[in-house]
């Protein structure tokens, strides 16, 4: 099912679900690295993303994973816009953490910059989807 969503417009319901799936897959495959990059991003940003993400200090990825799993299984009973905004906040922090990571070197710089850009794009699309969902127009 997720592969059908991959071509959907970013601010459609299938497109938003695809982006949630991507965030979930990335967290599942790189839990510790994602936690470190998230915390590095939170340390660098002067935003409320950690609060919006609903993340304790340090980040507990299990809570976000459960929300994303519930949304993707259709078992989520909460506010979809809030879930989208939380995932966007996580993505923004990981994006920032990828650029500011303390051990960055020339060999890793290109990959981390690309990863940061990808997370930034996903964050923006999820935020836009959250706004669209709040307006009742996410379809």
Give short role names for the model-derived ranges.
Residues 2-3, 83:
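Solenoid-repeat scaffolds in large eukaryotic assemblies
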Residues 3-67:
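Long, charge-patterned amphipathic interaction tracts in eukaryotic proteins
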Residues 8-13, 27-34, 74-82, 94-101, ...:
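Short secondary-structure junctions and interdomain/linker hinges
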Residues 96-139:
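Alpha-helical oligomerization segments
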Residues 44-108:
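Conserved binding-pocket/active-site segment within a compact domain
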Residues 4-5, 79, 111:
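Non-transmembrane, amphipathic alpha-helical segments
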């Amino acid at each position: 099912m997720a592969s059908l969503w991959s071509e959907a417009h970013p601010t459609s319901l299938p497109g938003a679900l695809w982006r949630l799936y991507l965030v979930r897959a990335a967290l599942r495959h790189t839990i510790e690295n994602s936690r470190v990059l998230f915390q590095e991003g939170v340390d660098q940003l002067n935003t409320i993303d950690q609060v919006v993400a609903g993340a304790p200090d340090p980040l507990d990825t299990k809570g976000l994973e459960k929300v994303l799993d519930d949304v993707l299984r259709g078992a989520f009973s909460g506010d979809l816009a809030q879930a989208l905004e939380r995932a966007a906040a996580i993505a923004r922090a990981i994006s920032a953490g990828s650029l500011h990571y303390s051990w960055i070197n020339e060999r890793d710089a290109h990959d981390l910059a690309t990863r940061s850009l990808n997370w930034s794009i996903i964050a923006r699309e999820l935020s836009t989807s959250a706004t669209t969902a709040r307006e009742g127009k996410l379809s």
